[in-house]
Amino acid sequence: MSNQDNERPAKTANQRGAARLAAVQALYQMDIGGTGVLEVVAEYEAHRLGQELDGDTYLKADASWFRSIVSGVVREQTRLDPLIGSALQDDWALSRLDSTVRAILRAGTFEILDRKDVPVAVIVTEYVEIAHAFFDDDEPKLVNAVLDRIAKQVRGEAKK
């Protein structure tokens, strides 16, 4: 096995992580700005994924993974939101959550439902890390707890 073969899985995983982060950002943008899915996907693919924008270099991301998450969340939102709502504490409504947290939970829930080929632990860990990139307080713990509850309900398994 060559060195190049050893590096390929890590690169793919890293590109999926970058795609997840970009998907959360795109979903946030859609939520706040009312941007449509086709417009936001085209913008990210042309100007953000692996590109430099306003002095920031965006990580190279798996574009098909990005598209799958963004379009899947939009397509399945009426199924995702009730699941997320049922996993929140009784006195919390999804609408009370920060838009970024909503985007993270929707993307994570979509992957738990749709990407059975990806272990729950990977999905939950990736989205908790994304939450840490945006928040220093309790939001990452909330993301962990909610996605873990959803995984138990949907797949019968939790993050190990």
Swiss-Prot record:
Please give the Gene Ontology molecular function terms for this protein: RNA binding
Question: Which SUPFAM superfamilies does UniProt cross-reference here?
Answer: NusB-like
Q: Name one GO biological process term.
A: transcription antitermination
Q: Does the keyword Transcription apply?
A: yes
Please give the GO cellular component terms listed in this UniProt entry. cytosol
Instruction: Identify one Pfam family in the record.
Output: NusB
- Cell membrane as UniProt keyword: no
Query: What are the alphabetically sorted keywords of the record?
Result: RNA-binding, Transcription, Transcription antitermination, Transcription regulation
Q: Which family does it belong to?
A: Belongs to the NusB family.
* Function noted in UniProt: Involved in transcription antitermination. Required for transcription of ribosomal RNA (rRNA) genes. Binds specifically to the boxA antiterminator sequence of the ribosomal RNA (rrn) operons.
**Record's NCBIfam families?**
nusB
Could you tell me what this protein is called?
A: Transcription antitermination protein NusB
